[in-house]
C-alpha cells in the first residue's frame, strides 16, 4: 500500500509542475545591422539626432554617434532624415479573439455565461490567421496584449504575443511573459447580467461579486499552502485539494504571478477597485479606457498604476461622457511626471496607427499647457506598455541588451505623413514596405494584391 501511495504522490507532483500551453516561440533568422545617421526616440525619454544603432543576434548592441564595425557581414542602413523607434506595443487588443472577417461564429472574446469566468484564457480563442495581425505590423506593432472582453466582472486571462503570424498560438506567445487577468467594472457587467434578471444588476452588485470571488480565492490558496506545508509522509496519505481552474487563476493573482488589468471608466469606481485590491493584497497593473483617469491621476501615480487610455474617444455611453482631451497628458504628468500613461487601441483600425493616436494625445496635452516632448510621448506606446505587460526588461526601449524590436520610419513618427518602412522583431526583418515583404494570412491567399481596395489597409 505504501508503494501505491508513493506512486500517486509522484504523479501529483509531475502534474503540478507541468506548465500548460507554454510558449514555443522561435525568432526568425536575425541580421547584423548598423543603422547610421538616424533620428532616434529610444523609448526612455531621449531624442537622439544623427545617431547610429547597432543590432546583432536579435539584440540591441550599441546606440551612439560614429559606431564603427569591422565585420564585413554587417548590413548598413542609411537612416538619414528618417526616424528609429522601439517596436510599438499595444496593451489592449482583441485581435484574434474578434478576428476579421467579423462573423458571429468567430466572435470568441466574451464567455458571457457567468459573471466570473477566471478559468478561460484568451489564447484559447485566438485565430492565428487573423489578417489584422499583418495590418498592425505595417503600423509598427511588434508586440500586442490580447484580452478577453468586458462582459464579466472577471473575464479571464490575457496573453502577450509577438506579432509574427504562425500556425499555433504557442509559437506566437511571448516567452515567459506573465498572463494578465481581465476585470471589468461599471455598465457592462451590470447590464449583461441585470438584463437577465441575475446579479450583478447594479454597481454595488459588481463590487459584491469581486469580493466574493477573492474570498473564495483566498480560501483556496490557504488550502493549497496548508497542503504544501505538510511533510512528504503526510502527503502520501492525504489527497491534495481538488483542483479548480477558476480559482487557480485567482490564486495566482494573489501570489503575484498574474497581472491585473481592469476595464473601468469612472474615477470613483477606479478608486474603489484600488480599495478592493488592498483588501485582498494584490496589485492593479493598469486601468483601461479610464476616461475619468485625469480626476485621480495622483492616486494612480501614488499606487504605481498605469492608465491605458484612448487619445480622443469618449461619449459613446453614459459612463464615457466626462472626459477631457488632455486625459493622457494629465495622467502622465501626475506627481511631477511620475505617472504611467499608455495609449491603447482596443480597435483593429486604431492599432494600425497607434503612433498617430499618441501624437493626438501629445498635441492635446501641450495645448492644455503641458510641455510634453516627442521623446516622452513615445514612452506611451513603447516602454510604458512593456512595463504593464511585464516585459520591460526585454523590450520597449532601445537599450543595449534588450531585444532588437525596431521600427524604421520614413519621417517623424508623430506625423500623419510618416509610415513604418521596415519593422524588425528580435533583429529579424518582419515587414518591408519598399519590397512588399511581410506575412500573408490564409484569408489573403488568392487575392492578387491584398492591399488593393482593403478598408483596413
Label every model-predicted segment:
Residues 20-31, 40, 44-85, 102:
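Histidine-rich, glycine-flanked metal-binding segment
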Residues 38-41, 387, 399-443:
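C-terminal cap of metal-dependent C-N hydrolases
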Residues 20, 28-30, 69, 425-457:
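Extracellular/periplasmic ectodomains of large secreted or surface enzymes and adhesion receptors
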Residues 38, 53, 58, 81, ...:
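Divalent metal-coordination and catalytic microenvironments
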Residues 24, 100-101, 107-120, 259, ...:
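His/Asp/Glu-enriched, well-ordered alpha-helical/loop segment
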Residues 4-13:
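Sec-dependent N-terminal signal peptides
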Residues 132, 137-288, 419, 425, ...:
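Polyanionic/metal-chelating signatures
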Amino acid at each position: 500500500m505504501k508503494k501505491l501511495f508513493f506512486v500517486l504522490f509522484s504523479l501529483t507532483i509531475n502534474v503540478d509542475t507541468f506548465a500548460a500551453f507554454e510558449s514555443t516561440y522561435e525568432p526568425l533568422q536575425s541580421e547584423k545591422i548598423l543603422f547610421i545617421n538616424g533620428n532616434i526616440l529610444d523609448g526612455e525619454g531621449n531624442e537622439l539626432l544623427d545617431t547610429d544603432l547597432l543590432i546583432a543576434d536579435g539584440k540591441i548592441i550599441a546606440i551612439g554617434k560614429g559606431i564603427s564595425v569591422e565585420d564585413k557581414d554587417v548590413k548598413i542602413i542609411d537612416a538619414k532624415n528618417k526616424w528609429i523607434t522601439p517596436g510599438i506595443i499595444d496593451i489592449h487588443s482583441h485581435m484574434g479573439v474578434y478576428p476579421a472577417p467579423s462573423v458571429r461564429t468567430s466572435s470568441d472574446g466574451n464567455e458571457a455565461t457567468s459573471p466570473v469566468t477566471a478559468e478561460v484564457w484568451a489564447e484559447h480563442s485566438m485565430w492565428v490567421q487573423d489578417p489584422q495581425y499583418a495590418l498592425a505590423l505595417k503600423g509598427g506593432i511588434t508586440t500586442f496584449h490580447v484580452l478577453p472582453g468586458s462582459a464579466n466582472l472577471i473575464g479571464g486571462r490575457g496573453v502577450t504575443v509577438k506579432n509574427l503570424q504562425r500556425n499555433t498560438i504557442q509559437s506566437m506567445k511571448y516567452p515567459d511573459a506573465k498572463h494578465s487577468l481581465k476585470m471589468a467594472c461599471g455598465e457592462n457587467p451590470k447590464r449583461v447580467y441585470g438584463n437577465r434578471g441575475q446579479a450583478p444588476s447594479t454597481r454595488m452588485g459588481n463590487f459584491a461579486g469581486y469580493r466574493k470571488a477573492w474570498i473564495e480565492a483566498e480560501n483556496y490558496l490557504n488550502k493549497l499552502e496548508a497542503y504544501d506545508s505538510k511533510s512528504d509522509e503526510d502527503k502520501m496519505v492525504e489527497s491534495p485539494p481538488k483542483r479548480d481552474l477558476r480559482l487557480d487563476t485567482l490564486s495566482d493573482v494573489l501570489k503575484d504571478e498574474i497581472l491585473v488589468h481592469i476595464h473601468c471608466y469612472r474615477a470613483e469606481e477606479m478608486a474603489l477597485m484600488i480599495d478592493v485590491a488592498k483588501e485582498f493584497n494584490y496589485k492593479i497593473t493598469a486601468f483601461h479606457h479610464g476616461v475619468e483617469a485625469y480626476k485621480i491621476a495622483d492616486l494612480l501615480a501614488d499606487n504605481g498604476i498605469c492608465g491605458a487610455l484612448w487619445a480622443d474617444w469618449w461619449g459613446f455611453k453614459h459612463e464615457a461622457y466626462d472626459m477631457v482631451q488632455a486625459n493622457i497628458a494629465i495622467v502622465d504628468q501626475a506627481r511631477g511626471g511620475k505617472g504611467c500613461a499608455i495609449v491603447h487601441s482596443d480597435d483593429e483600425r486604431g492599432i494600425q496607427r497607434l503612433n498617430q493616436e499618441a501624437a493626438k494625445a501629445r498635441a492635446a496635452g501641450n495645448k492644455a499647457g503641458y510641455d510634453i516632448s516627442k521623446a516622452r510621448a513615445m514612452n506611451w506606446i513603447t516602454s510604458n506598455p512593456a512595463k504593464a505587460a511585464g516585459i520591460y526588461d526585454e523590450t520597449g526601449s532601445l537599450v543595449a541588451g534588450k531585444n532588437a524590436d525596431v521600427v524604421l520610419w520614413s519621417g517623424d513618427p508623430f506625423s500623419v505623413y510618416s509610415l513604418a518602412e521596415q519593422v524588425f522583431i528580435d533583429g529579424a526583418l518582419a515587414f518591408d514596405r519598399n519590397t512588399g515583404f511581410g506575412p500573408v494570412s490564409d484569408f489573403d491567399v488568392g487575392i492578387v494584391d491584398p492591399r488593393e481596395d482593403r478598408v483596413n489597409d
